[in-house]
Amino acid sequence: MTTEHEVRRLDRVIIRFAGDSGDGMQLTGDRFTAQTASFGNDLSTLPNFPAEIRAPAGTLPGVSSFQLHFADHDILTPGDAPNVLVAMNPAALKANIGDVPRGGEIIVNTDEFAKRAMAKVGYATSPLEDGSLDGYRVHPVPLTTLTIEALKGFGLARKEAERSKNMFALGLLSWMYHRPTEGTEAFLRRKFAKKPQIAAANVAAFRAGWNFGETTEDFAVSYEVAPATRAFPTGTYRNISGNLALAYGLIAAGRQAGLPLFLGSYPITPASDILHELSRHKNFGVRTFQAEDEIAGIGAALGAAFGGSLAVTTTSGPGVALKSETVGLAVSLELPLLVVDIQRGGPSTGLPTKTEQADLLQAMYGRNGEAPVPIVAPKTPADCFDAALEAARIALTYRTPVMLLSDGYLANGSEPWRIPDLEELPDLRVQFASGPNHTLDDGTEVFWPYKRDPRTLARPWAVPGTPGLEHRIG
């Protein structure tokens, strides 16, 4: 039977999904975000995953989380203190409870709170029974058991059925916050199109979570957060991550400049998504080159710039150190080159999945000799699109390498982005040198590769192979 529930209206909510790396927290958060975006809320996300390579299950280092802040008004950050924590095991609870304010809601998967699992993270007694959670609104839910029960008729092994518990949790939260569900069900059918049994099981688990919220008396209240209609100017919107926005911005810059876009890059977290995305867009004149190392990546990009392409290389802090000599060469050659640094945490190799904004001084001064470089830094995930266009404008106009400093939070975080009209994009067209630009005293016409434009002080950009413009630079 359906239980009558109170519906409370809120202006904003912060939800954090937390569990083991294999519990599907990133997918759960991503789908809840997609539902929230389609509903029309303003939002900001913060994915957070371990720096270790698949830490042991049930341990504190292995906890993965996804935080979403959504509201009926304009918001700028993913927030600090989650109002709701979904903890899939004791490790997730212990790692995140310190961030939840008193009075916050905690949904706990009680099936995972066995003595051994609790001892693994230092719980001598069960936090669900010893009073340590008395200041919170705790909802003990046997997510694993309920999921297995809901999937009994699908002929799945127990382990296969257990994997859908994140979809049960997603269904429950979707009911709690009145999220639209059609998009998630369609996504699951697409994702598992080659495994229709698994697709149907995940949809069933998702619906079971929704129905559990609708029928149980433990959840007496559901919540509504109205669309943020006043936060968005008129236009077409989509949810976008920083790296995706940056990739789209680079493609747009190439099209607006009338130049082929070339990316020379070595895969490195958290910048690799840009390489992956750009490799899908050959139809827009994009060429990607996965190099054997950081130096080869920027070397290829600099060669492409010399050849008349809009050239880009992507990396993170350790890679910037390796690329510094070639950046200095680009300065002396006066060639346009975009160096995208998606900053991560720590010195040396650092922590690939953690974030930091500590590369500014390296970007400003990390080269020998006098080699100044302009720096552009986006402020939000959506702003990465405009930052890419601005970096390209500076590089092309003034014939200089430009550093674009993003970071792991911006790269993986997301927010609504208004898709711009083509008329709103800047004109980045460049004029290549096509003939002599100086006349000697004896009347001979010659090409001077470092003759300055009186307005921009940039040198002419002569593409190799142009008759009569043979020259040496550097």
State where each predicted segment sits.
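Active-site cofactor/cluster-binding pocket
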Residues: 1-257
